């Protein structure tokens, strides 16, 4: 079987969150819209219990190999089992589930590295629960990079939030705001610019991506009066990127970077910290937004929301972002494979 016939590998996420809900709802949506075949690396009993809570009739089929999932997908939701997951109560996360959560992520990476899956799509995890169990990585992005680089040179993963109308990249991700100025460097910003440009070319078909880089300080530093990061760090990174032939503008004041007219001038915005990128993105594209990790040797996407424990099992969770994540993962893998 070529990659075209392989399923997407969908991870378990935190089983007490809305991952099971949106997985079930995404599969049921296949009769109304195009959903690329996927296999959930998880637990059939947890899915069946959540389906009962939601009043859904969903046939669930366990498979021993991912290759069986594509043929099964039209009739049943394929599940590749993970070991060691006990009973799960919706909305009540437990550290006891962490080994199964990690196993699901590791299995997904292994499948895509072996060519048994086209891409990795991850359901939401709870960082607080993982940290409580001794998880040493800030989040999914860093863990996936560690798994992917286990046998080679370290990777530099880049988190991009993508929708049809807006793409944003935070240079720093899951760190306290007070640490951002200290951690920003010319080389870090330049690496994010280069990896973003490469990803836009490879996976999204942009021949010469236009990148807009935000400043860190109000008014992009007001020529040094409100901070020197723009002069000492950000502008040198932009100049280095331009010297390599990249189309990069900035540093721009962040407060005027996201209105409609400004968005028409670039293909992706490079921002200095998490909320500078994600607040405008989630305001403009919450349900259709997808989290993409660039800089990995495989495609990875996820919904752009969290575990939403309070919604688990209530029927109020929307599968839209997961559906868009599945579709984008499929489209990106086709582009990378030269089939689109």
Where do the PLM segments sit?
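Ligand-binding beta-strand-loop-alpha-helix segment within the catalytic cores
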Residues: 161-191
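Contiguous, glycine/small-aliphatic-enriched amphipathic segments in soluble metabolic enzymes
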Residues: 1-142, 183, 187-272, 276-291, ...
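Short, flexible loop segments at boundaries between secondary-structure elements
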Residues: 146-158, 162-166, 294-310
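A broad structural signal for alpha-helix termini and local helix breaks/kinks
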Residues: 54-55, 148-152, 175, 204
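Small-molecule pocket liners
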Residues: 38, 141, 157-158, 167-169
């Amino acid at each position: 079987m070529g990659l075209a016939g392989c399923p997407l590998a969908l991870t378990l996420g935190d089983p007490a969150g809305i991952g099971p809900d949106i997985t079930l709802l995404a599969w049921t949506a296949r009769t109304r819209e195009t959903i690329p075949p996927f296999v959930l690396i998880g637990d059939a009993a947890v899915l069946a219990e959540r389906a009962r809570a939601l009043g859904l009739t969903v046939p669930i089929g366990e498979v021993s190999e991912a290759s069986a999932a594509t043929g099964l997908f039209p009739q049943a939701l394929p599940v590749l089992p993970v070991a060691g997951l006990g009973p799960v109560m919706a909305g009540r996360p437990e550290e006891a589930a962490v080994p199964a959560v990690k196993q699901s992520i590791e299995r997904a990476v292994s499948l895509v590295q072996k060519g048994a899956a086209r891409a990795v799509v991850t359901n939401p995890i709870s960082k607080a629960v993982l940290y409580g169990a001794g998880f040493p990585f800030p989040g999914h992005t860093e863990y996936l990079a560690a798994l992917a680089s286990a046998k080679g040179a370290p990777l530099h993963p880049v988190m991009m939030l993508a929708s049809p109308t807006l793409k944003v990249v935070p240079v720093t991700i899951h760190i306290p705001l007070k640490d951002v100025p200290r951690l920003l460097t010319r080389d870090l910003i330049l690496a994010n610019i280069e990896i973003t440009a490469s990803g836009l070319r490879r996976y999204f078909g942009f021949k010469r991506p236009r990148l807009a880089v935000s400043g860190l300080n109000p008014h992009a530093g007001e020529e040094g009066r409100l901070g020197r990061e723009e002069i000492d760090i950000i502008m040198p990174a932009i100049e280095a990127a331009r010297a390599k032939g990249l189309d990069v503008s900035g540093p721009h004041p962040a407060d005027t970077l996201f209105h409609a007219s400004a968005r028409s001038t670039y293909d992706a915005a490079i921002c200095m910290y998490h909320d500078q990128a994600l607040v405008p993105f989630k305001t403009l594209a919450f349900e259709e937004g997808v989290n993409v990790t660039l800089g990995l040797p495989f495609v990875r996407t996820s919904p752009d929301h969290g575990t939403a424990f309070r919604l688990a099992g209530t029927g109020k969770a929307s599968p839209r972002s997961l559906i868009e994540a599945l579709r984008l993962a499929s489209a990106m893998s086709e582009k990378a494979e030269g089939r689109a």
